[in-house]
A protein has these predicted regions:
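Accessory "access/gating" subregions that flank catalytic or transport cores
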Residues: 149-161, 284-310, 316-346, 350-445
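DNA major-groove recognition helix of helix-turn-helix/homeodomain DNA-binding modules
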Residues: 28-43
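Short alpha-helical DNA-recognition segment
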Residues: 1-17
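Short coil turns linking two alpha-helices in DNA-binding domains
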Residues: 11-14, 26, 40
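Long, charge-dense tracts
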Residues: 60-136
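Short, charged recognition helix plus adjacent turn
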Residues: 47-59, 63
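Active-site-surrounding "flap" and adjacent substrate/cofactor-binding loops of secreted or lumenal enzymes
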Residues: 187-224
């Protein structure tokens, strides 16, 4: 401070006042300062942020300020998921085959500004791409168009008020118990899961995985981290999980905004009640897009390679709970929630689950529940076709083993897309219900 005061012929106290904002330099002094430190006079007078940028230029010799891409989470970097984007776009029917090699070449680049720029170009290509002429599916994302392509299915039953509370309680407890069954090994692949289960006498699976099961194997031989996981014999209550968090968040949305909440209300609640780290894949992208100013439906579309992944399908249970026997109302709410982060089949999965749960409140017939859920998604969609493949296979006598083999053949669990896409997860859910034949334990295992 003394050196600065001497440099510009003022007192130390004057410099202190300039720093704390109680007084400001005369114009002649500002001109001297701008010349001495190579900072524009405009930036000194008008814009502190501009001054900071120019100081960076002077001090570090940089023409621009760039992020440290190594600090950027995978889900927040569009170019990091460029192969997922390719698979997603192809399945959507976009005519991008001529760019295939470019997608794969970009995926091999290290994280950085160059890869980001290539990703920006890819997004432009995707946005402007046309549908392939032979693409057989019609998959809208607006509620009106979805309804126009849905096939009605009315089971003709009324609410049994004596059983309703038990039904809804069972739905929530069942969700929690099923979630805990999988949480111990969430993310493990079958090539490691099956040997683990066999080693503990739990194959075919018929009970929870215990810490004692893990202690009996050499965990270091597994790629999957078996050590730092919750197990049924080491917990006191259900650990937090995004699957169940979203059910509570949906309840909060209804409490705050009522039954007529909007897609924008959902995003407002997301920002208000949970930090960014609580959201994954499509939800993380939508959250970040909203913070940047993108509102629904753009929040679901802009640089979102996860737009048909399972996130929306796990969020909409609550809308089924609060609309017992009214699957259309449940599906409508699910659409409002899902459309902030997903399109097409990603939305359909959410509507299917909400409608099916609404029907489950008044029926015990598994097939009726499934078909009622399907009545609220386009019959011209991949989702409808995939789920009906499971339903028809079951009715035609295909074994449970063959059913799951067919799902694995169509969707590769060893890719992020195959693992997390809405459709295979819906197929697995439907198969588990059908082949479980009303036995809850058999279905979740």
């Amino acid at each position: 401070r003394e050196q600065f005061a001497e440099e510009f012929g003022v007192s130390r106290q004057t410099v202190l006042k300039w720093e704390n904002g109680t007084s400001y330099p005369e114009l002649s002094k500002l001109i001297d300062i701008s010349r001495r430190f190579d900072i524009s006079l405009d930036s000194l007078i008008l814009d502190r942020n501009m001054r900071m940028i120019e100081e960076f230029k002077g001090n570090y010799g940089k023409k621009t300020i760039s992020p440290n891409y190594s600090n950027m989470h995978f889900w927040e970097s569009y170019s990091s998921a460029i192969i997922d984007e390719y698979r997603q776009s192809v399945d959507e029917g976009l005519d991008i085959e001529e760019y295939k090699d470019i997608f794969f070449d970009i995926s091999k680049l290290p994280q950085g500004a160059i890869k980001k720029k290539f990703g920006d170009v890819i997004f432009e290509i995707i946005t402007e791409a046309k549908k392939r002429e032979n693409y057989k599916y019609n998959e809208p994302s607006t509620l009106e168009e979805i309804k126009a392509l849905s096939k009605p299915y009315n089971i003709g039953k009324k609410i049994d008020t004596d059983r309703l509370e038990s039904k809804i309680n069972g739905a929530w407890v069942g969700r929690v118990c099923g979630c805990m069954l999988g949480k111990s090994v969430e993310g493990i692949h079958t090539d490691e899961l099956i040997p683990l289960l066999k080693n503990s006498g739990n194959y075919p699976m018929h009970r929870y995985i215990l810490k004692s099961d893990i202690d009996a194997v050499d965990a270091s031989k597994f790629k999957y981290d078996l050590i730092n996981r919750p197990y049924a014999d080491t917990i006191d209550g259900m650990p937090p999980d995004d699957d169940t968090n979203y059910t509570l968040l949906a309840q909060q949305i209804i409490d705050d905004y009522g039954f007529d909440f909007t897609p924008l209300n959902v995003l407002e609640a997301w920002v208000k009640y949970q930090p960014k780290e609580a959201y994954c894949t499509a939800e993380r992208v939508a959250f970040c897009n909203f913070i940047k100013g993108y509102e629904p439906p753009c929040s679901a579309i802009y640089k979102n390679p996860y737009r048909e992944w399972i996130g929306a399908q796990i969020r909409t249970d609550y809308y089924g709970y609060i609309n017992p026997g009214n699957p259309e109302a449940a599906a409508d709410m699910a659409w409002r929630d899902a459309s902030i982060s997903h399109i097409k089949n990603g939305i359909y999965g959410a509507m299917f689950v909400a409608a099916a749960l609404s029907t489950a409140a008044i029926s015990d017939n598994i097939e009726d529940i499934i078909l009622s859920g399907l009545a609220h998604v386009p019959h011209t969609s991949r989702f409808y076709e995939d789920v009906m493949q499971v339903v028809n296979g079951y009715k035609n006598g295909i074994s449970c083993k063959e059913c799951f083999e067919n799902i694995h053949e169509k969707y590769d669990e060893y890719t992020g897309y195959g693992w997390c896409h809405t459709n295979p997860n819906a197929m697995i859910t439907v198969a588990s219900l059908l082949y479980g034949e009303g036995n809850y334990g058999k279905s979740i295992c």
